[in-house]
Amino acid sequence: MTEDEIRVPIYFMAGFLESGKSTFLDFTIEQEYFQIDGQTLLILCEEGEVEFDEKKLRKSRTAVEILNSLEELTPERLVAYDAFYSPERVIIEYNGMWQVSKFEEMQLPRDWGIVQHIVTVDASTFQVYMNNMKSLFVEMVRNADMVLFNRCQTDMPLASFRRSVKVVNQSAEIIFEDEEGEIEDIFACLLYTSDAADDLIGV
């Protein structure tokens, strides 16, 4: 299905717990560019460290549904949401411990389709997750349009972080942010190396 054929666009957000998904969404919801005339359905698949502001949700005509387990995320439930809300768009904050492939392989309601896939990463814990849950992260970023590393510090091995993504998904846009916002992309000419490929052997 092409984007022109999609009636209900899905904005899919993945990332491990406390990676900044909720913070990113809470900020986005109040931005002028986010506002549309129709209903937005926000499906939360885990409880993050940030609670969404009810006033912001009402102002942006955003309805929230919370799913507590992967078993609750079914084609039938999504069809029911489509019938009940008639959403103009859907945002899914996916649980970082669930395989992304489970959703990618799911039969979606008629004319629903993913138009943007974003992954958020807490740079301060990235290496720990890569050491322990590499396969989950690789699956998250394989089809991502954007990978956002937040809580970055200049003494972190950011070039290595970038290579870890590019070896899996060369087309993904990679953004590094610190507390002040986006860090200038100093890696524009940096090509991924065999080091990153070696790191991912066995995934």
Language-model features and meaning:
Residues 105-112, 123-168:
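Conserved C-terminal guanine-recognition region of P-loop GTPase G domains, centered on the G4
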Residues 5-14, 19, 23-116, 123:
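Nucleotide-state-sensitive switch-loop elements of NTP-binding domains
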Residues 76, 127-130, 186:
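Short, charged, surface-exposed secondary-structure boundary motifs
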Residues 1-3:
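Pre-Walker A adenine-sensing motif
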Residues 154-194:
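C-terminal accessory "lid"/substrate-recognition subdomains
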